[in-house]
Amino acid sequence: MTNRDIVWHEASITKEEYQQKNKHKSSILWLTGLSGSGKSTIANAAARELFEQGYQVIVLDGDNIRHGLNRDLGFSDEDRKENIRRIGEVAKLFVQQGTIVITAFISPFREDRQQVRELVEAGEFNEVYIKCDLDICEQRDPKGLYKKARNGEIPFFTGIDSPYEEPEAPELVLDSGQHDREACKNQLIEFVKQKLS
């Protein structure tokens, strides 16, 4: 059996029907940035507030995904690409169900983020750059990962010995190095209300 033998089954409920019932558009809000920039914190705080306001929302967090779906992947460039490919496909399924998907992944490579953008319709992928200087992320170091990377205990660590390619034209920039996480969360929620309501 090959992929040519597998047939895509159309859903009985369309994306538009879900969106009409939810009273908002579906979208991927792809939070990208260095470890320690605040992606997960901002994503979860925004999701909580949006949920309380009646939005259908889910957070897909990089660490959590690596405990399950992507636990077989390491941190080589190839594994990082596969990590993002898989989560892009999962996010697409949620978009088809009328959900706002907030992802929190370092996703260091522009090409990988672009491939996720191409999975969904125009306007359904919104790149959100959580901007924060490396030195601030290292000072925060909530998981102790930068210290381990500097000591050679973690190879291929983004920002230390593996590159992070900043977004060139993100739909939104949240500067978590200059603004507290509450302000960043509020900016993200305002973006959702303006773009998806």
UniProtKB/Swiss-Prot annotation:
Gene Ontology molecular function, alphabetical: adenylylsulfate kinase activity; ATP binding
Top EC group: transferase
Alphabetic keyword roster: ATP-binding, Kinase, Nucleotide-binding, Phosphoprotein, Transferase
Pathway linked to the protein: Sulfur metabolism; hydrogen sulfide biosynthesis; sulfite from sulfate: step 2/3
Keyword Zinc carried by entry: no
Family statement drawn from the similarity comment of this UniProt entry: Belongs to the APS kinase family.
Active site (UniProt): 107
Role of this protein: Catalyzes the synthesis of activated sulfate.
Ligand binding (ATP): 33-40
GO term, biological process aspect, one: hydrogen sulfide biosynthetic process
Claim: ATP-binding is one of the keywords in the record: yes
Entry's induction text: Up-regulated by sulfur starvation and repressed by cysteine. Also induced by O-acetyl-L-serine (OAS), a direct precursor of cysteine, maybe via inactivation of a putative transcriptional repressor of the cysH operon whose activity is controlled by the intracellular levels of OAS.
Gene name, Swiss-Prot/TrEMBL: cysC
Highest taxon in the source lineage: Bacteria
Pfam families in the record: APS_kinase
InterPro entries noted in UniProt: APS_kinase (IPR002891), P-loop_NTPase (IPR027417)
EC number: 2.7.1.25
Catalytic reactions on record: adenosine 5'-phosphosulfate + ATP = 3'-phosphoadenylyl sulfate + ADP + H(+)
Protein name (record): Probable adenylyl-sulfate kinase
